[in-house]
Amino acid sequence: MNQVDGRHVVEERGAWGVLAILTAINLLNYIDRFVFPAVAEGIKRSSLNPSDTALGFASTAFLGVYLIAAPFFGPAGDRPNRTKWVAAGILLWSVATALGGLARTMPELLGARALVGIGEAAYSAISPAILASYFPEERRARAFAIFFAATPVGAALGYVLGGFVEAHWGWRQAFYIAGAPGPVLAWLVLRVRAPVPAQGARGRERGALGTYRHLLRNGQYRLIILGYAAYTFATGGIGIWMPVFVQRAHGTSSVVANTQLGSMLAVTGLLGAVGGGLLGERLLRRWREAYLWLSGITTLLAAPLAWIAFTTANITVYLVTLFAAELLIFTCTAPINSKLVDLVPPGMRAAAMALCIFTIHLLGDVPSPTLIGWISDRSTIQQGVLVIPVAVVVSGATWILAAWRGGRLSTAQVIEA
C-alpha cells in the first residue's frame, strides 16, 4: 500500500511536526516505564523490602494491565477522535507514575504501576496508526525509525534519571519527576488533527471482534507477532534486570550501573533504530520481505553475543558484547513495526497494533521479569538471565520463517492471508 490515508494528502511539514510531538511523547513513555527498574535496588533496601520475585511481579502488574487494556483502545485508534484518547492516556500514566512515589506498601506500588499500564496502552496502540497516516510506505520506515528511537533513548534516560535521583534524593522523588511533563505533552497532542483512516467504515462494519478475527486469519501477521513476543520476552528481561545484574555480578554501584547501561541503551538504540530504518528502506526497493529478513538475521546474530555478555566474569567483555548485542537487537525496531502497519489496510492499523501489544506482552515481558526473578531467587541472577538469548534465537528464527512464507505469496495474498 503506497497511499497516505485520510481525506487529503498531509503537507510534509505538518507530518514532521506530528512526528516530533509523538516522538517526544514516546520518549516520556519510556522514561516513566524505566524509572522503575532503575530504582529497584533502592526499593528493595527501603521499608517495602520486596523479594526479587515481588520486584519482577511489579513489572508484571504493569504489563498485565497494559496488554489487557490495549485491545480496547485498538478500535478507538481507527476512529476520528483518536487524539483525545491519546491525551487521556498520557494524563493517566503521568499521574499514576507520580502516585508510585507515595506508595507505602508493595500492593500500593503495584496499583500505581497498573494504572500506568492503562494510560500507556492508549498511547501505544493508537500512535503508530496516527503516524502511519502521515507517511507513505516508501518513507514510513524512516519516520518509524525516529519514533521508535525514542524507545531506547527514553529507557536510557529513565535509567540515568532514576539512578541519579535515587542516589541523591531517594527513589520516591524519581517517580515524582518522571510524571511531571505529562500534562504539557497531553495538551500538545490535542492540537494534532490526525487524518481519518480511509477504510474506517469497513472496520466499523466488522466490529472490534470481527476485526481481530480478520487479523488473526493472516498467517504472516501471526508469525510476526509471535516472533515479536519472543523478542519482547528478551528485551523485557534486559530492561528490568540488567541494572540489578551488573550490580550483583560485577559489583558496580547503582549510579555507575544505571549510567553505563543508560548510555549504552541510548547509543545502541538510536544507531540501531535509525540505521535499521534507513537500511530497511534501501533493501525494500529490491526485496518485498526485506524488513523481515533484516529483522530475523540481525536478531539471530545478537544471540551468541548476549550469551557471552551474561556468562563472562570480565566487565569489559560484558560491556562490549552487550553493546554489540543491543545494537543488533535494535536494528529491527523500525523495520518490524513498519511491516506490521504495511501488512494491513489503513482502517485496521490501530487494531493490528493493539492485538500485537496484547500478544507480545502476554507471551513476552509479562512472564520474563518474574521468571528471571524466580530463577534468581533459587540460584543466581547470572543463571536467571540466560533465558534471554534463548528467546532471541526464537524471535529471529520466527521472523525468517515469516519472510520465507511472505516471499511465496503475492502482495494481495499476504494482506488477506
Task: Annotate each predicted stretch with a short phrase.
Residues D5-E11, V196-I225, A249:
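Juxtamembrane intracellular "pre-TM" segments in multi-pass secondary transporters
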